[in-house]
Amino acid sequence: MNYFELFKFSPAFDIDTAVLAERYRELQRAVHPDKFANDTEQQRLLSVQRTAQVNDGYQTLKDPIRRAEHMLSLRGIDLSHETTTVKDTAFLMQQMEWREALEDIRDSADPQECIDELYDSFAAYRTKLTKLLTAQLSSDSEEDALLAADQVRKLKFMAKLHDELTRIEDALLD
């Protein structure tokens, strides 16, 4: 299913999330199972299925990584069950530096400063990747689609690192 069509968007990485939320509420009202309580079993089942599609579409388009994956899947590139690793040497080196910095936080004289520096580093790198991804997803070339898939892989890795950093920060606050 093309969630961009469902929510009446042109396929694009940058979408107005406020408009997305508004269209989500409209679709929810239109397909909500309570609206079909007195209809046939088949119509009620269809309403439940449609509600699930609307919910999944909203969650997909709301999240930038899932949105990019969806755009790539519409172009025949499925990253959902992928085990391909990033082969970009510079990114792998950066990844190792981040991992070492994560390990050093607890022994640091000022753990919060280290955490803040890592959050800033992640944000700067994520911004760089997102700019590349936006340009690559707006292109019609197969090569750019494959490059976009690499950016998504990197963003997924960074999301895991960000979650790990958040867990470390939470543990230090306890």
Curated annotation (Swiss-Prot):
The keyword Chaperone applies. One of its GO terms (molecular function) is protein-folding chaperone binding. One of its GO terms (biological process) is protein complex oligomerization. The keyword Chaperone applies. Keywords: Chaperone. It comes from the Bacteria. InterPro entries: DnaJ_domain (IPR001623), HscB (IPR004640), HscB_C_sf (IPR036386), HscB_oligo_C (IPR009073), J_dom_sf (IPR036869). Residues 2-74 form the J domain. GO terms for cellular component: iron-sulfur cluster transfer complex. Co-chaperone involved in the maturation of iron-sulfur cluster-containing proteins. Seems to help targeting proteins to be folded toward HscA. Belongs to the HscB family. PANTHER family: IRON-SULFUR CLUSTER CO-CHAPERONE PROTEIN HSCB. NCBIfam families: hscB, PRK05014.1. Interacts with HscA and stimulates its ATPase activity. This is Co-chaperone protein HscB homolog. The lineage of its organism: Bacteria, Pseudomonadati, Pseudomonadota, Gammaproteobacteria, Alteromonadales.
